[in-house]
Amino acid sequence: WREKIEKAWKAGVTRGRYRYVWSHDGERAGVEFLADKIHARRGYRWINPVHEVIVPDGAEKSAIIGGLTLHHYPDPSKSRAAYLPLLELAVSEDPNNDRNAHYLGREYYFRGMYDKAIKELSRHLALPSAVWREERAASMRYIAASYRALGNSPEAEKWYVRAYLESPDSREPAFDYARMLYAEGNYAGAVFWINKALAVTVRTLSYISS
């Protein structure tokens, strides 16, 4: 791997981007995206108590490191009990960090804390810095799923449509909405929306894509 990094590290490069396989489907890659945590020895600092990211102290120049893949194999025996408190700490330290607001709202949804999920994800959408359409659509999908879990299907439908309109180039909004309609016996609607999902043929290399 060192040779691949050195080949990409031309003059002026301070940060490297590489293929990161976050999950696996048997021997195949599941969720994958470009990660960027290879950086120069100086000029960067790490922030956040969880979902750590690196931020440059000044100008930076990144390069794609071709042929380098990092595989993520989480330890299933390791407790995740501290994860939610650390996310809450991250948001309390920097309430205007849109990424952490999304992560916290998503975690509330995963924990079945649906009212808190709706509140925090709505706050994420209202932040001026929350401009990444894929992530905004993901927040809308989790809001929709929370409303559905609370038995409010009309509100869930509204948010699924909003998610699709926010990021029509992502499969996930249309797929999730189709799955809900199928479960409710609305087969015509499910077919319509699953075809919307199938019409998206290019997968984005972001962590949102599943």
What do these predicted ranges mean?
Residues S79, N97, R136, S170, ...:
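Residues that mark the junctions of alpha-helical repeat units in TPR/alpha-solenoid scaffolds
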Residues A81-L84, E88-V91, I118, L125, ...:
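Tetratricopeptide repeat
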Residues W1-K119:
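Catalytic-site signature of metal-activated, phosphate-bearing donor transferases
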